[in-house]
Amino acid sequence: MSSSSAAALGSDDGCSPAELRPSRYESQKRRDWQTFTQYLAAHRPPLELRRCSGAHVLEFLRYLDRFGKTRVHEPPCPSYGGRSPSAAGPVAAAAAACQCPLRQAWGSLDALVGRLRAAYDERHGRAGEPDAVAGAGAVATDSTSSSSAAAANPFAARAVRLYLRDVRDAQAMARGISYHKKKKRRGGNMNGARGGGGGGARAGVNDGDATAPPVAVTPGLPLPPLPPCLNGVPFEYCDFGSVLGGAHGAHGGHGGGGGGFYGAGVYLPFLYNTFS
């Protein structure tokens, strides 16, 4: 079909030629699938796609290493681990004459496996299966078919994932980098550690008040008389509680909850050391 006829066909359908052209991802996925099918046809003995497993995918990935362009240094090499030797000296000459093998980069292999997995699902996954029987068992049939299709996909095998992880770790060690992320510390624990050193007795009182259940005290009850030995002793206000009334409650004053009979914040200045 000529370009003019293709343009005319696109105009009749209401779609421009740019919209009919497949995306770069789709084109690359189609080329990768053709390469894999050619590899299966050239395999000795010839291998059918329905008999393909994760082990055959690993053979295909190792076969692609022949055409790799990423030099992966090995432990005897001076450049192993990301070390850059100086410009002069025998170490630099040995690094220049490095004979480490060329491999496929981990990122290229990971993207290739992802495209082939998607291509397999399009051709032999749920798209190629007959429709499930409508009715009450339709949902169960769909879930069963999707799980069986995922299990039958050789590019989604666990061995392939482990191989990609090993390739990533080996190339990371050769380059002297790490893909492991550091664990972030929680901000709440750090703030608590910073504020835990100070506070003293006041912090202890506030913590006790926050966890203590409220005490229901009937309002309007008359206060009991003070002991005879405390007659004439002046009372003052204190933020840290009451010697007679106990800890500082949520509501201060006479009859307040959690403040005792004589209210929160009342103490005896002359007898403070005696009672404490």
UniProtKB/Swiss-Prot annotation:
GO terms for molecular function: DNA binding. Residues 21-30 have a biased composition (Basic and acidic residues). Disruption phenotype: Enlarged sterile lemma in florets of the spikelet, caused by homeotic transformation of the sterile lemma into a lemma. Elongated empty glumes, which mimic the lemmas and have the epidermal morphology of lemmas with four or five vascular bundles. PROSITE patterns: ALOG. Residues 189-202 have a biased composition (Gly residues). It is found in: Nucleus. Probable transcription regulator that acts as a developmental regulator by promoting cell growth in response to light. Transcription regulator that restrains empty glumes growth, lemmas of the sterile florets located at the lateral side of the rice spikelet, to maintain their small size, probably by repressing lemma identity via transcription regulation. This is Protein G1. It comes from Oryza sativa subsp. japonica. The gene is G1.
